[in-house]
């Protein structure tokens, strides 16, 4: 199989990411994080960014093999410290209000078998050191977009029955192009129309200002409180300079932050989670008074326990997102082993930090003010998928009345 018009569609994709995703403006600095395997796409993105007037494009190359070797052989004292040059680079990007485009294509199991203590220590150190960047991103001080590219090992995981490596990669690119609307006659208008539909759902939820959400499904009975003056967001966002951008491509969600002090019940994951180079399956979480009191996983149990119990703020939730089961990604029937795609096929929750923009005026609040408002503060943010065609969700008003939001995995109205 050879994907028809691949080069033409890759160019369209690069333009969509730069012009509509990040929305590069004259004078911008752009930081591009991308795997060495995606050199062709990186070149197209860099060319397009400069064509739109970017003053500087900084490419931060990643490599699964090199990363794995580091974790296998580097001593702990190197892994639990972040080098000064990385912190200096972060500060440079912040000073220049750099937009951030992350193109994900990693092997979901790249770090299988690596010492969990090493992974946990490194993730914790990076989370603490990169906190200023995380805060800038989660409060939309700068534009940021997360997208994907078809990496070989990832493609083989998603399409294990493909006739060849080339076919697996082509099949994955085909899904990326479909879900990002690259095949549409006018991809820009297709995104505008899609964003308008999602915004209408967010507007309805913002008008209601529910006090809580109640989720029920096999293995799930969970009530999440919502903060006062919470904000449901959808496809588009606005940075501190008043410029629009798309945080995720693709996206099918509307999302907000729960009140981290008000979660009670239990929930079971419905899709695998790829986290820190490990694939985690069968996650079960129990909450009491907002805190995770028990968490298990059929596969990757220790990785999940380390995530929750070794990171500050990781015992509470920072995001709840609504995605109808009939979404195009869900209906593809494909498990992508990649959160960007799998979260857009399913209702999901996030362990850890909330986005500051999830309450009115949050982008201008201090960390302490956000916490008082009910938004969880943490150095991690990890989504896991809980939705299915058997999930019902009710919105609960202040007076206790219930409004059906989801029935059998889809919007009730």
Kindly give the residue locations of the regions a language model identified.
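Active-site lining segments that contact anionic ligands and/or coordinate catalytic metals
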Residues: 262-264, 280-282, 289-292, 315-319, ...
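Long, well-ordered mid-to-C-terminal structural blocks that present hydrophobic/aromatic surfaces
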Residues: 256-310
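Active-site bordering "gate/hinge" segments
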Residues: 1-264, 395, 401-403, 411-413
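Short linear motifs in exposed loops
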Residues: 225, 295-296, 406
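Dual-mode signal for accessory low-complexity, basic/Gly-rich regions
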Residues: 294-363
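Extended hydrophobic packing segments that form well-structured cores
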Residues: 368-413
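A short secondary-structure junction signal
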Residues: 112-115, 155-160, 236-237, 278-281, ...
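Short solvent-exposed loop/turn micro-motifs enriched in small/polar/acidic residues
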Residues: 15, 206-208, 276-279, 313, ...
């Amino acid at each position: 199989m050879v994907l028809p018009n691949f080069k033409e569609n890759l160019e369209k994709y690069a333009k969509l990411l730069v012009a509509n995703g990040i929305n590069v403006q004259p004078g911008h600095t752009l930081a591009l994080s991308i795997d060495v395997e995606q050199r062709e796409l990186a070149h197209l993105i860099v060319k397009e960014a400069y064509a739109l007037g970017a003053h500087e494009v900084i490419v931060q190359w990643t490599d699964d093999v090199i990363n794995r070797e580091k974790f296998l052989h580097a001593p702990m004292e190197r892994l639990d410290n972040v080098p000064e040059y990385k912190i200096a680079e972060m500060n440079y990007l912040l000073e220049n209000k750099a937009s951030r485009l992350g193109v994900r294509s990693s092997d979901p199991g790249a770090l299988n078998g690596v010492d969990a203590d090493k992974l946990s220590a490194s993730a914790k150190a990076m989370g603490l050191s990169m906190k200023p960047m995380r805060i800038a991103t989660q409060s939309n001080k700068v534009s940021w977009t997360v997208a994907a590219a078809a990496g070989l090992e990832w493609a083989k995981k998603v399409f294990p029955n493909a006739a060849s490596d080339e076919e697996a990669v082509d099949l994955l690119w085909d899904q990326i192009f479909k879900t990002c609307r690259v095949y549409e006659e006018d991809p820009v208008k297709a995104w505008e129309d899609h964003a308008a539909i999602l915004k209408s759902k967010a507007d309805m939820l913002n008008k209601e200002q529910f006090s809580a959400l109640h989720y029920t499904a096999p293995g799930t009975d969970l009530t999440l409180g919502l903060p006062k003056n919470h904000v449901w967001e959808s496809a588009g966002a606005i940075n501190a300079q008043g410029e629009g951008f798309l945080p995720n491509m693709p996206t099918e969600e509307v999302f907000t932050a729960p009140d981290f002090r008000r979660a009670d019940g239990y929930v079971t994951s419905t899709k695998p989670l790829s986290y820190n180079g490990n694939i985690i399956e069968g996650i079960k979480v129990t909450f009491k008074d907002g805190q995770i009191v028990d968490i298990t996983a059929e596969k990757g149990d220790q990785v999940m326990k380390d995530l929750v119990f070794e990171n500050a703020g990781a015992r509470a939730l920072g995001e709840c997102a609504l995605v109808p089961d009939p979404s195009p990604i869900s209906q593809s029937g494909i498990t992508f082993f990649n959160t960007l795609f799998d979260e857009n096929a399913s209702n999901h929750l996030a362990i850890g930090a909330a986005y500051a923009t999830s309450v009115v005026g949050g982008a201008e609040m201090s960390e302490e003010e956000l916490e008082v408002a009910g938004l969880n503060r943490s150095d991690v943010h990890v989504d896991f998928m809980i939705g299915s065609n058997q999930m019902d969700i009710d919105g609960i008003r202040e007076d206790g009345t219930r409004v059906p939001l989801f029935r059998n995995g889809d919007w009730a109205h």
